[in-house]
Amino acid sequence: MKYFIITIDTEGDNLWRWKPGQEITTKNVRYLARFQELCSRYGFKPVWLSNWEMINDSSFVEFINKNVEMDSCELGMHLHAWNNPPFYELPRGEHSGAPYLIEYPREIMEAKLTAITEKMKEQFGYVPVTHRAGRWAMNQTYFELLYQYGYRIDCSYTPGISWRDSMGQTPDYAGPDYRDVSKKVQKIHGITEVPVTVERTHRMFLDCNKSWKSNVKTVLF
């Protein structure tokens, strides 16, 4: 039997344009029910991979709790390092982008995971088992910390895609290269890695960065 898993990165409005000190709104919460209803109509159970500002939105918490109670969705965790407390200043490169969590010292990575995990417990009463890294970036330390905090499934690998052109914040820090990772489910440091399905296409339907354009591929969530 083959399984069809739908995962949704669930985060604040226009998060990629956010600058430190600006408010991150979550108006998109009011539209999530439409997609949930569509999934439920066809018997699909989506995984809402949710980041810091979303799990602090009372309407979102109510939406998730209602649908989890009906067994129509699953809650997952999604961590964007730049707006997930505690805040820690990294050096900034000349052509830098948003920071990857794996750029931070281990103790800061752990502190950020502690913050969002404890908030999950506070808001929902439990820690979800599924996770996706912000900006897809994983390394050995990240896998080890996820296991330590009770997460058991990751879906950050994008087989066939390199993010080396997607810079982090610190000087010359490039994203991960997943061109050679397996498309099959595998165990990594106790975590079950379920790679994202990647479909080759002739055109892009996203506002792509350079690495997406060079690969000419679309990631299906």
Task: Give the location of each predicted region.
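Active-site-adjacent pocket scaffolds in enzyme catalytic domains
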Residues: A133-F221
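Hydrophobic faces of well-ordered beta-strands that scaffold small-molecule active sites
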Residues: F4-I8, P46-W48, L75-L79, V129-H131, ...
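Active-site beta->alpha N-cap acidic-glycine motif
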Residues: M1-D71
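Metal-dependent polysaccharide deacetylase catalytic core of the NodB/CE4 family, i.e.
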Residues: W52-A137, V198-R200
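A structural signal for the main folded, soluble domain(s) of proteins
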Residues: T25-K27, R34, L38, N67-L75, ...
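A solvent-exposed, charged loop/short amphipathic helix patch at secondary-structure junctions
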Residues: K19-P20, R92-L101, W212-F221
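Short acidic/His/Gly/Ser-rich catalytic and metal-binding motifs that mark active-site loops
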Residues: G12-R17, N84-L90, M204
